[in-house]
Amino acid sequence: MANVVVVGAQWGDEGKGKIVDWLSERADVIARFQGGHNAGHTLVIDGEVFKLHALPSGVVRGGKLSVIGNGVVLDPWHLVKEIATIRDQGVDISPETLMIAENTPLILPIHGELDRAREEAASSGTKIGTTGRGIGPAYEDKVGRRSVRVADLADRATLEAHVDRALQHHDPLRRGLGIDPIDRNALIDALTEIAPQILQYAAPVWKVLNEKRKAGKRILFEGAQGALLDIDFGTYPFVTSSNVIAGQAATGVGLGPNAIDYTLGIVKAYTTRVGEGPFPTELEDADGQRLGERGHEFGTTTGRKRRCGWFDAALVRQTCATSGVTGISLTKLDVLDGFETLKICVGYDLDGTRLDYLPTAADQQARCTPIYEEMPGWSDSTEGARSWADLPAAAIKYVRRVEELIQCPVALLSTSPEREDTILVTDPFAD
């Protein structure tokens, strides 16, 4: 049975939630493998909107096992609230349908406080555009071997020892940033209080998933954010604090690399970005505003307006390579309806030299100007199309040109937020 990884191939917000939900019908297990609740997925099911941040998208589908893997950093208080919200919408969530890896690091209140204080202290031009939810500092503690992990909640003495180790690091940082010292006892009490609500879902996820795989069950790995925010291959330092590319999927749940059979890259038919950092095809004119309005480009997590621009084939070709993308899902094609002319970035000019990739150095990225190829647009609507026959000829040509430029085929084409409005070319779960 095929196992599929879904990754964003741009700067996030590509429409992964809908595609994961669409694919989850074919999967037995849906697993989150990186990130925190700084990324949001919006699902529209039978007209009802579900907004998820920490929970895997599969929770809204009955009969599926949803998993939060060790590659995630988890805010336990946020998770409990999110579970309550989704339950209020009629979704059943129990230890039979949700598992959390025992070795998942926790996001503590001290992480969010540090995150926000750093961003406020940063000078103009050095702000990352973080959501302030503590994801970066939580990953720092993981790498620094001072995390409080899910399993630590089960024993008070162990919990206290891990909290003390973290405070040895955090208290000096807080003094330097002018933040009050941490109330150790209050933090331990808060963790002790929340512990039973988290521990009921705790499990050796690596073992469970290896057994599922041996039994021939289909696993869908759900990525958050996008490959251009990857800590190694993104537009550093304007990136997230985890590996986002497909290779992280196995590591982030405790499976070997041979567990991945198909990598589906989610690609928006234009480009958006939230927060700071380079964006070669950004439009600050009427076309950019039109893309934002038609695409409803506001962040699920923060409500921040997204920056919008033309499709960047050079960047997507790059992310398809670093994630080993087998095929893409092209989303929001309908947002381009009505444009007389469309532009696609095919490369960059850097100080007179043409490049077919975005360079690594931040100063060079900032100096790259896009080289465009123009294509005719279309006036007919593509919204709700469910077959190629429903698409205008110019829209089909646009899709085919995207495939040529990124050197990767379209497996799925999405034409609205509704899960049924999807054109299937290749089933990623096909054996």
Swiss-Prot record:
Positions binding IMP in this chain are 13-16, 38-41, 131, 145, 225, 240, 304
Gene Ontology terms, cellular component aspect? cytoplasm
Q: Where in the cell is it found?
A: Cytoplasm
Reactions accelerated catalytically: IMP + L-aspartate + GTP = N(6)-(1,2-dicarboxyethyl)-AMP + GDP + phosphate + 2 H(+)
Binding-site residues for GTP, renumbered to this chain: 12-18, 40-42, 306, 332-334, 414-416
Sites binding Mg(2+) sit at: 13, 40
Family affiliation? Belongs to the adenylosuccinate synthetase family.
Q: Which domain of life is it from?
A: Bacteria
Q: In which pathway does it act?
A: Purine metabolism; AMP biosynthesis via de novo pathway; AMP from IMP: step 1/2
Spell out the molecular function terms from Gene Ontology.
Answer: adenylosuccinate synthase activity; GTP binding; magnesium ion binding
Function comment: Plays an important role in the de novo pathway of purine nucleotide biosynthesis. Catalyzes the first committed step in the biosynthesis of AMP from IMP.
- What EC number(s) does this enzyme carry? 6.3.4.4
Is Metal-binding set as a keyword in this record?
A: yes
The record's free-text note on cofactor binding = Binds 1 Mg(2+) ion per subunit.
The record's listing under InterPro entries reads: Adenylosuccin_syn_GTP-bd, Adenylosuccin_syn_Lys_AS, Adenylosuccinate_synth_dom1, Adenylosuccinate_synth_dom2, Adenylosuccinate_synth_dom3, Adenylosuccinate_synthetase, P-loop_NTPase
UniProt keyword list = Cytoplasm, GTP-binding, Ligase, Magnesium, Metal-binding, Nucleotide-binding, Purine biosynthesis
Q: Where does substrate bind?
A: 300-306
Q: Does the keyword Nucleotide-binding apply?
A: yes
Q: Required cofactors, per record?
A: Mg(2+)
* First-listed, main subcellular location of the protein, grouped into a coarse class: cytoplasm
Q: Which PANTHER family match?
A: ADENYLOSUCCINATE SYNTHETASE
Q: What is the uppermost EC class here?
A: ligase
Report the protein name in the record.
Adenylosuccinate synthetase
- Which SMART domains would you find in this protein's record? Adenylsucc_synt
